Amino acid sequence: MAMASAACSCTDGTWWVYALPALLGSDTLCAHPALLAGLIFLATVSVALLAWATSPGGPAWTNGRGASASLLSWDPVVCPCSAASSRCPGAAAPRPRRDGPRRRPRAKELMAFSVGDTPAVVSSCPATAREVLAHPSFADRPVKRSARELMFARAIGFAPNGEYWRRLRRVASTHLFSPRRVASHEPGRQGDAEAMLRSIAAEQSASGAVALRPHLQAAALNNIMGSVFGTRYDVTSGAGAAEAEHLKSMVREGFELLGAFNWSDHLPWLAHLYDPSNVTRRCAALVPRVQTFVRGVIDEHRRRRQNSAALNDNADFVDVLLSLEGDEKLGDDDMVAILWEMVFRGTDTTALLTEWCMAELVRHPAVQARVRAEVDAAVGAGGCPTDADVARMPYLQAVVKETLRAHPPGPLLSWARLATADVPLCNGMVVPAGTTAMVNMWAITHDAAVWADPDAFAPERFLPSEGGADVDVRGVDLRLAPFGAGRRVCPGKNLGLTTVGLWVARLVHAFQWALPDGAAAVCLDEVLKLSLEMKTPLVAAAIPRTA
């Protein structure tokens, strides 16, 4: 019935084709049989194209795909270019339809739609999302053209499921992001925080307010550079500032290319005809710059290791990769891809999440005061919070979790999954092989059936001592899984959470944060690029507590 109704509705738009014979007259048509044949052909093609484009789920679900997915809920408003807007740079974050579950209860579990020739499903239900993220047939990711050309197909994020990817995952969990390795880099995180606090104090003194994001991005860049390459930049000096700006420009270009919507990913025949973002040309220009930079760092570390091959606890990622032997040993091309991905993924995500935290603390002075009191109780007014201190601050941890709930960095868990086989789900639905699957984490974290009063910023919801839930955000509980779950969970999640927690503690401990003079409110409008960003970067008054 759904297929029939869709077909009926699509023919309504072709009325003009059938009206043409009446307008032209029978004599004209009889005298020109070629014109009559052309009109019949035009009418047939018009009906076929519209039926194809407006079929349940959209055009990608034709050609038999829909037969194996007959229990899916179809998006009734999909057309060939539907869903593109939510993936375009600068698009608003995907919002759930508040009345969707009431009108179409199964749509929340799994909704089918099309992006060009790509069949896709999206889940806004924690139980179904867990199946999508944890099922072994969803262990692959669809590789965008930009990701492939930027070498990410050989890195942890996009490498296909197989022996090579399993080796990368083992190296990441055992060597790069182990608890001991994360702890060993704390002095670097503290140093980056100190430099950030000094630059914030200087801008506050000079301008009376602080644009926070550039300070966070500079600190995040140095932090990830220290962890990955063992290098930090003095951005106040000419040489250091120039090299840091060069690296930032490469990271920024990579973010734009990977976050840009490219129609050739979904209509391959457009690859050489339509590339409005110049993805191919820009990737071809960026890759040699990245290779030159990263290979130079690898060569320098290799020369250094000739004198001392010993690997200490605070070794950077390059040294760790160079120390691998046997089956774990990697070639230079693979190391370039892995190291570049680490820099790329670890820079803006940390900065943007910290900015969201601080924006909410500016909006909620009582929450900020409670965080500050918790930090002061741990280290005193003149102390310096450490990673160990932050781990014992339940309210600060709750603030970070609530920020992740209110503003999930990847609202559509941006890097989707690809079904490598037909996947039957517990609810009776079947996701066919070749389908791209996504989880709408924004919809889940703002669903009143999952979270009480979801539009309120309430860290207490994560405090068991105050009636809240002790939710693990590292992929265990799909009510809040901002780093993904299953085999493709983000390997750097612990490093990211540790860094954000420490920096929020340092920022609140050093400054009283408030709206600058003349500002009415913090703007929480969102923009979806590769991550969910504040559309208007936070500007606040950072009043030193010693003043």
UniProtKB/Swiss-Prot annotation:
Its cofactor is heme. InterPro entries: Cyt_P450, Cyt_P450_CS, Cyt_P450_E_grp-I, Cyt_P450_sf, Cytochrome_P450_78A. Residues 84-94 have a biased composition (Low complexity). GO terms for molecular function: heme binding; iron ion binding; monooxygenase activity; oxidoreductase activity, acting on paired donors, with incorporation or reduction of molecular oxygen. It holds the Pfam family p450. Heme binds at residue 490. PANTHER family: CYTOCHROME P450 78A7, CYTOCHROME P450 78A7-RELATED. This is Cytochrome P450 78A1.
